[in-house]
A protein has these predicted regions:
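Conserved alpha-helical scaffold segments that buttress catalytic/binding sites
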Residues: 1-140
Length: 140
């Protein structure tokens, strides 16, 4: 996040959904007013999200959906994973799409499975289902 703020003058602020508290606390002071973090557990509380959104999202949004935020029971990715359920992630994305000017989207956090292994194929199929579900939401 800090690198993006340093290298891209068009990015004014980054909102991290589901960032670990230790990561947020370790941010250098110069970024504290340009990086806002939303706790993963608070996602299910609509009023808390609404207050956070109004306070921290005031410009057009480029949305990066990192599937690493999802619980491993939802999808296995190539990084440390969070605990969020897909339904909760989709709820937050829907609120952003509904209330903000979204100028672009990308999805990252692909599975690590190998297509040559049975377990890897299952992980890829699960990953494809998650991608399809997210893309369907974005198309609506």
């Amino acid at each position: 996040a800090a690198r993006v703020l340093d290298e891209n003058p068009h990015v004014r602020k980054i909102v991290l959904l589901g960032a670990e508290e230790e990561l947020v606390k370790s941010l250098p002071e110069k970024y504290k007013d340009r990086i806002a973090a939303y706790n993963e557990e608070a996602v299910v509380h609509d009023r808390i999200w609404e207050e956070f959104r109004k306070k921290h999202i005031e410009v057009p949004v480029y949305l990066t959906i990192d599937k690493d935020i999802l619980d491993p029971s939802q999808v296995k990715t190539n990084w440390n994973q969070g605990k969020m359920k897909l339904a909760d992630l989709k709820k937050v994305i829907y609120q952003i799409l509904l209330h903000e000017q979204v100028i672009g989207v990308d999805i990252c956090g692909e599975c690590t499975g190998s297509i040559l292994e049975e377990a890897g194929r299952k992980e890829m199929e699960q990953d494809d289902r998650i991608n399809g579900s997210l893309l369907h939401l974005l198309e609506c």
